[in-house]
Amino acid sequence: MMRIALFLLTNLAVMVVFGLVLSLTGIQSSSVQGLMIMALLFGFGGSFVSLLMSKWMALRSVGGEVIEQPRNERERWLVNTVATQARQAGIAMPQVAIYHAPDINAFATGARRDASLVAVSTGLLQNMSPDEAEAVIAHEISHIANGDMVTMTLIQGVVNTFVIFISRILAQLAAGFMGGNRDDGEESNGNPLIYFAVATVLELVFGILASIITMWFSRHREFHADAGSAKLVGREKMIAALQRLKTSYEPQEATSMMAFCINGKSKSLSELFMTHPPLDKRIEALRTGEYLK
């Protein structure tokens, strides 16, 4: 969840900055083809900037510290576990980081399979058994081995392209309609302030709506990462880890879902914006072996 949230926030910020620069400098495409090229460049540009910054952003956001040399038995176990699983998964040894937080959490990120990072919280190491922690680490290793961050970047790039393209087409129409035609009979792009305001608002709104697509992909890949963990360390260990998460977080999640859904009943709507499937669904998928085939 951490890596996806940071990726999307950074990506959205880059898109907004690009849009501001274009609008303030008066750079507008005069043709649909030109606008599409611009949307492709900036849409994928935002995604790849987010990907390249992902390790730095993730570590900075949680105050994580990369383990260069293990200082105690716990760090030694963590590094050895990551090394063993990386070797089993056929990827290069990721950087290993630890950060101080009471919650049970871990994430993996990085621009390439062979230049990745796995970070775990102190809460995970303190509150999970070695088998459960091993399963969570294997889950993150599976994300790296599956190339999920790169695939997410490509999907987000396509989504960004359409968000920018459609937003600016509609902004040009709105600016032209509200700005009227020029007296000399030449075609006008309309009021630039209207264009700037409409384009910015539409990019934000469409960006949030488009996140439904990326959230769906994220949930889908979580099932595959769970299956990858089961293959590396065993199905029962991964199920035990998810059950531990369920007992640790379910009461808090119920409260937050009520706030989000207003009446606390419309869980299906809230799931559209979740990066992870409900824990019960993940446990059931492991038990049935749906993604282990």
Swiss-Prot record:
GO terms for biological process: proteolysis. Belongs to the peptidase M48B family. GO terms for molecular function: metalloendopeptidase activity; zinc ion binding. This is Protease HtpX. It comes from Escherichia fergusonii (strain ATCC 35469 / DSM 13698 / CCUG 18766 / IAM 14443 / JCM 21226 / LMG 7866 / NBRC 102419 / NCTC 12128 / CDC 0568-73). The gene is htpX. Binds 1 zinc ion per subunit. It is an enzyme of class 3 (hydrolase). Its EC number is 3.4.24.-. The active site is at E140. Zn(2+) binds at H139, H143, E222.
